[in-house]
Amino acid sequence: MSNKLAALIILDGFGLRDETVGNAVAQAKKPNFDRYWNKYPHQTLTASGEAVGLPDGQMGNSEVGHLNIGAGRIVYQSLTRVNVAIREGEFEQNETFLAAMKHVKEKGTNLHLFGLLSDGGVHSHIHHLYALLKLAKKEGVENVYIHGFLDGRDVGPQTAEKYIKELQDQIEEIGVGEIATLSGRYYSMDRDKRWDRVEKAYRAMAYGEGPKYQNPLDVVKDSYENGIYDEFVIPSVITKENGEPVATIKDNDAVIFYNFRPDRAIQISNTFTNDDFRDFDRGDKHPKNLHFVCLTHFSETVDGYVAFKPVNLDNTVGEVLSQNGLKQLRIAETEKYPHVTFFMSGGREEKFPGEERILIDSPKVATYDLKPEMSAYEVKDALVKEIEAEKHNAIILNFANPDMVGHSGKVEPTVKAIEAVDECLGEVVDAILAKGGYAIITADHGNADVLITEEGKPHTAHTTNPVPVIVTKEGVTLREGGILGDLAPTLLDLLGVEKPKEMTGSSLIQK
């Protein structure tokens, strides 16, 4: 085995900011962290927003953080992936969308767009619908019909009118599209096999059955008058002046379902695409030979084309270490064990050859502010023993405390949590240095740095503040502007391993 040793130490939820009020990171006595910060090259990293594949300004989290760290690149979450594709012009070149549009032009049939009508960004984004309308216009598709699912859950409960008006303005401006049905997500986006709900949405879309209105806004107005708000609006059909539905989904039509989150998109998709569907009677005129497009991969059961296929994360840090014959150890307590294993390996459960894992049980307490040290000392003891035994070249370690205790929004226990972690950090890093190894000390996102809101209430969420990075190697400098995706390349650099082409991050050590 190579005698090289480098460790990646993640202080979970340890963000940096200058203001000390409500900031447990600043208030804690942490002589070891401060000693390393003052002695060794250090910088800050961006751990939120587009730097970790989330929408601009969105706080990071442990899952996303560890995915980015392990992948050595920005791992785009679905919403951001589509946003970036629209911005960069790739969206309008997407072959799956273009094939659907070609299908309806060749067959002389209709294109139906359906999905959640809001900018909540949890299941869908209305801007993705607008991008599809623009693409349909550009491709010369004339018969485009929208089946809008009303939200009221990821956005305010009475906001549907705003989104319908905005959509109507876009339709007018772009010059294509017409609203055909509207239904509350309670019906169209059920995920709990309540098929009576799904059937109502299906029958409105496929058969034009349900309450009928000429003006889409009247659907909402009428519902509100009956005390029924957005999420629960009964699937309703928009009609022409003669009372006929504007459009129903028929044989040989194309559908693009623009929700990106799968769980609530699967049932309604199966209703339209699955030949063996038996959960309710779809009737004699069930639309056949649909060209059905899902924005992302919904499920193996959905028989449709996928516009944004799953991204396989090849050559994550664990795989590269393994390929180079290096021995690695992943260690954390229960709360963050999946993060240093599954998420660090890009969503892979199995170990790589040469990978060892140590799981230390988290304490059995109702909330961790009751035991701020959690299992940090046990993690430290187990790890120091491993370092002494000289069995591993690479160590990936997570101290959970700043995040898990920080979620209490209580300053005093979180200060204690950080002080416990600092004590453990000192023993671990000094043991590594004594073996001639290197440590990278960093974090995956902020949390313990903001525990009080501007109104003086407990702040229990993550933050968008930068996180520290210290590399315990003297005589080098670290570059500015780093991101979490640069940490794996830095670890490989310390071990003298070339980073693979898939890792678009780069070592923080300036050459």
UniProtKB/Swiss-Prot annotation:
Binds 2 manganese ions per subunit. Keywords: Glycolysis, Isomerase, Manganese, Metal-binding, Phosphoprotein, Sporulation. Mn(2+) 2 binds at D12, S62, D444, H445. The keyword Manganese applies. Pfam families: iPGM_N, Metalloenzyme. PANTHER family: 2,3-BISPHOSPHOGLYCERATE-INDEPENDENT PHOSPHOGLYCERATE MUTASE (PTHR31637:SF0). This is 2,3-bisphosphoglycerate-independent phosphoglycerate mutase. It comes from Bacillus licheniformis (strain ATCC 14580 / DSM 13 / JCM 2505 / CCUG 7422 / NBRC 12200 / NCIMB 9375 / NCTC 10341 / NRRL NRS-1264 / Gibson 46). The lineage of its organism: Bacteria, Bacillati, Bacillota, Bacilli, Bacillales. The gene is gpmI.
